[in-house]
Each structure stands twice: as C-alpha cells, then as structure tokens.
Amino acid sequence: LLSINCGELVFKTSDSELEVFLSKQIGRDDAVSFAVDKDNKNESELILKRGSFNMNLRQGEYSLLVTDKKGRNITIPILINAGETSEIDFEFPTHIPDNCIYIHKGYYYSNISHHAAHGRHSYTDSYFLLDRELTIGEYLEFFKTVKEEKLRQLYNPDLLFHIDGKFQLRKLFGDDYKILPPYNENMPVVGISVEGANAFCRYMSEKIGMKCRLPYFVELEKAARGTGRRLYVWGNRFKSDYALLAGNAAVKEYPNGAPPKTFPHDYSLFGAYDLTGNVRELVQLNRNLDYYVLYGG
C-alpha cells in the first residue's frame, strides 16, 4: 500500500548488470544542474540498485543515472505523483553517437507557462539529441561538400552585418569558405534555411550511418523541461545571468551568440546545453505537418 504522499517507481530491464543511481533533485532553482553526481554523496543521498527493481518514493522529482558495464551513463528524470505508479522499461542503446544524449521514451508535461502551470501530458518515443548547438565550423564541413552553385546559394546562411553604418544582408561564407567576421567556427550556426538544415541532416545520416533529422517541437521541449513542471531548465525562478538572454550583461561580450556550453547553468536535466538562451533552434512542428518553428533563445 502507498501512503498518501508516496508513489511507486517500477524500473524494468533485461540487463541485470546495469547500475542505477537514484537521487532526489535538490536545489531546483539554484543548482548548476540536476544531474546525478554519484561521486558527491553528501549532496545527493544516492540509492544504488542493480537490474530491475520497484520501490515506493515520496512524491517529487528524481533523477536516475543508469550506468552499463562499459561505463556509459544515461540520465532519466522522473516525476513521482502521489498514489500513482511510474514505470520505466529500459534497455541501454547499443550505440550513442558522439556529442549526443539519449532521451528515454515516456511522458512529460508540455506547454507549461506562468499562465498554464499544469500543462498537458505529452508522449515521445526514445531519441538521440545533440547535447549542444551546432557550430559554424561543423556546418561548414558539410557546406564544403556542396558543389552545385544553386544549392550553395541556398545553403549558405544569410545574416545581417553592420557595415558602414548600415545593416546589410550578406552570406556567412565567402567564395573561399572564409567565415565573415565577427563570426567564427566556434560560434553556433545561425541564418540557415530549412533546406540547408535538412541537407545537413542527410549529410550527417550518411556520415554516421544513422538517420538524422531536425527534432520535433515536443522532443526539444522535453529535452529542456524534463518530466516535471519547471518553467526553465534550472527551475521556476527566472535568472537572467543563467543563460545568454537580452537581460544578461554577457550580451555585450557575445552580441552574436556564444560558443556552445559557455553558460553552465543553461543545462537541462537530460544533459543538453543552451535550450533557454543563446541562439534559437529550428525544429519541426510535428511528424505529420511540414511546418517549422524557432524554439528558445
């Protein structure tokens, strides 16, 4: 039987050697991140389990750190509601692409805002996501493979440059692939077209041998929000210095975007950076509609 303030966690896996560290999420508005720190037990009150298990927990937000025998880690945020059972059916993916996080299938609360605190229960399948924004240098590697001039014009990002006291629309890459200043290869790429973004995904699909695409809106929202009802990746209180936003004095230092992972507080429960600030992300609205929206930033 569950007490009035408790719910049940059921974790199922066929791998009895998996180590699962369970931690209550603490300091939800002030911690740098909410990832489980198994080397700092004083802050996390860790519970270690192996393989499948079930247990009763007080209602609240928790994190699971799942570690396989290769030493790979996956973080799974969970929300325990009083009187309810949260079931996780988990198998470790055989391969995790470089610089990617794995986001486990399941429900999360979408469309949370100051005016809609409860949100809607939305579901996603499991997926991989780049753990930070794509850089200009990475996009340039793809762009150098494009030979047709018409496509080169379409895929070359259009950006506004302040030249001789006027704003002028220019291409990011020159004829010799030179990146026009003030941009550089370490900054997040901006100004790309939908066609350019999808062409880059096709290029990456061939490069890594896995299908790549732009994320759906719900996938990026889940990666940012976790499974609870937080307003921001770090919690519910807005803090302008936690991310590169208009109210942050760091905008003077990074007027055109900062290198990914510059702001450690802008780090989600799943392990993705810059989903609140820095540049915006281009996402598909959903799998059934050929519409695209800009998210975050």
Predicted regions: what they are:
Residues 27, 45-69, 73, 77, ...:
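A short glycine-rich, aromatic-capped structural motif
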Residues 1-3:
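Long, contiguous interaction/targeting segments characteristic
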Residues 21-48:
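Short amphipathic beta-strand segments in non-cytosolic proteins
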Residues 17, 107-110, 114-115, 135, ...:
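Active-site/binding-pocket entry motifs
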Residues 8, 17-19, 61:
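Exposed beta-strand and adjacent loop surfaces of beta-rich binding modules
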Residues 7-14, 24:
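A short, amphipathic beta-strand motif
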Residues 20-22, 64-65:
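Beta-strand-rich binding/interaction modules
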Residues 175-297:
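Functional-site microenvironments in short loops/helix caps that host divalent-cation chemistry
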